[in-house]
Amino acid sequence: MKEILLELGICLAAAAFLMIYHECVRLFVYMFCQKSVKCFRTAPWKVWRYIDPVGLILSLTSMVPISKPYFFRVRDRRTNLCLGMAGVVSLVVVLAGSVAVLRLGYGGIDGLDHLVLPHWWNAIVPILVQYLALLSAGMLAANLFPISTFDMGMIVAGVSPAAYLGMIKADGIVKLIFVLVVLLDMIHYGASRLIVLFL
């Protein structure tokens, strides 16, 4: 029972870290791109607001953490593109780093074999790295859906505002497809196969 609770806690901690990290990277890029904004309110720095309870439940059930995005009011196409790309790149960096740690075996981590360790406390870091890999792959796949508030929506808004308007009109249908994909566990299946392929 301790092992199950430990694994659930580690999964929730990894999901919360990814949600906060993903949104904070976008916040730094926004501050860099919008240098004319002198006074930045404290609301974006309250990082616990980025942790979504539904996203935590989805991270436990489907390995797809969804963070509450901070809604940037951006009219500049270049800033929209930079925000979307920053979100995608941040998730790719976490995915590549955790897969590299799993593949190269840093810190006693040897691939996906964490249950052979003699004591449960020795398994904390390997389980954390595995969940970071799985959850970042799931969050990356989710953010590549053309939903207006996700990273792909920001990229489309940066490339073509007319296409973004069309995407907003079809947002309900795309969200329905996204929910079906998450419920059918297709993102988790694809993410786990991708990670096993890299290992």
Description of each model-found segment:
Residues 1-199:
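Hydrophobic transmembrane alpha-helices and their immediate loop junctions
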